[in-house]
UniProtKB/Swiss-Prot annotation:
Annotated protein name in UniProt: Large ribosomal subunit protein uL2
UniProt xrefs under HAMAP family: Ribosomal_uL2_B
GO molecular function terms listed in the Swiss-Prot or TrEMBL record: rRNA binding; structural constituent of ribosome; transferase activity
This protein's GO CC annotations: large ribosomal subunit
Keyword Ribonucleoprotein found: yes
GO BP terms: cytoplasmic translation
Record flagged with keyword Transcription regulation: no
Protein task: One of the primary rRNA binding proteins. Required for association of the 30S and 50S subunits to form the 70S ribosome, for tRNA binding and peptide bond formation. It has been suggested to have peptidyltransferase activity; this is somewhat controversial. Makes several contacts with the 16S rRNA in the 70S ribosome.
Pfam families: Ribosomal_L2, Ribosomal_L2_C
Organism of provenance: Stenotrophomonas maltophilia (strain K279a)
Amino acid sequence: MPLMKFKPTSPGRRSAVRVVTPDLHKGAPHAALVESQSRSGGRNHHGRITVRHVGGGAKQHYRIIDFKRNKLGIPARVERIEYDPNRTAHIALLCYVDGERRYIIAPKGLKAGDQVIAGSDAPIKAGNTLPLRNIPVGTTIHCIELKPGKGAQIARAAGAAVQLVAREGIYATLRLRSGEMRKVPVECCATIGEVGNDEHSLEKLGKAGAKRWRGVRPTVRGAAMNPVDHPHGGGEAKAGQGNPHPVTPWGVPTKGYKTRHNKRTQQFIVRDRRG
């Protein structure tokens, strides 16, 4: 997909870069697979902010995505590729031979008219879903389960890809894009290929307003706050953070400090993403 730049009629247009997607469906989504979603503005049921930098943005309908791919052995035809405002990847509308329609994450190279299938004996082709025990070592995969039958949890964003590097006993070893090596049960399912819309990372919004349209509010530096608001706050004129090590608003070290405390699943990480 080509990239598009604009005439510099304003500072926002001068900096913007967009991905041209002429093959995307121009109409409304499939009505039976759409539901409304309310916005919290980052607040909990007490009205207090629990997630910062969230609020505003354009209204969106949620597209119900089939992350489980549990219609086994039934072929489906790709009707169209659609835009999904809830994720960076595009989605594909499948029509099964029994008439049912479902959305899936669109892998790279998938187009309208292609056929896909899920099952243990499915061919190794982009868009097909198989258990890890039936996928050849070295294959590039995405939409991977962490627990059998729970649905895809890993590698769902635009351009995401994971490589199956080994299989030993009841576990398969995966190399994630971050560099992390992780063990996953071989009964977990994964989809062949990498996620489409891989040029999404080359896009530039161009102006702050484009970020606000997406429901993202500004991020304020701690050093620009008062001491009551942040450990880095206060000082005369443009003072620095003052601390020997940077911390979060709640005093927890940041910028490289490890915060993972889930010992139960630590055994499945063969190599940390930091090396």
